[in-house]
């Protein structure tokens, strides 16, 4: 699962994810509700889920900023967690993929969290 090629606080639309997942095993299998991706487990099995948090915003990427190169830094990497889960066919997962924030010249923000939860 991905950001479907978009950023921002509202997340992707159905059309954006349809386009992003075209030609993959997710084609037609992801439904968007308020920017959250819903995926129905196709078969009862043990699934490995690896979730990546978004990286933080880059600082000082404006080449005209007078404090570069002293304070120009790339944002830190997001956390990564992984686990194996036995999931039953028909169970719906809600997936919210964290987004990289805007880059600014000073006091940029952290990246968005990534969440994978059961729908019930």
Where are these regions (language model features)?
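Boundary/junction segments of secreted and surface-exposed precursor proteins
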Residues: 1-19
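N-terminal and secondary-structure boundary signal
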Residues: 13, 17-33, 66-68
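Extracellular and analogous surface-interaction loops
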Residues: 23, 28-31, 36-47, 83-90, ...
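A short beta-strand element within beta-rich, extracytoplasmic domains
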Residues: 46-55
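Extended, low-complexity, turn-rich repeat/linker tracts enriched in Gly/Pro/Ser/Thr and Asp/Glu
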Residues: 55-60, 101-105
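Short, surface-exposed beta-strand/strand-loop-strand elements in extracellular ectodomains
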Residues: 58-79
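Secretome/extracellular-domain signature
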Residues: 75-120
């Amino acid at each position: 699962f991905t950001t479907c090629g978009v950023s921002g606080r509202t997340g992707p639309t159905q059309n954006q994810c349809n386009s992003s997942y075209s030609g993959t095993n997710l084609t037609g299998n992801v439904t968007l509700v308020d920017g959250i991706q819903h995926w129905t487990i196709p078969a009862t099995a043990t699934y490995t889920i690896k979730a990546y948090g978004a990286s933080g915003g880059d600082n000082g990427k404006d080449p005209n900023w007078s404090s570069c190169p002293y304070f120009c830094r790339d944002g830190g990497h997001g956390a990564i967690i992984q686990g194996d889960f036995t999931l039953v066919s028909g169970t719906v997962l809600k997936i919210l993929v964290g987004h990289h924030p805007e880059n600014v010249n000073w006091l940029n923000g952290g990246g968005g969290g990534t969440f994978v939860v059961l729908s019930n």
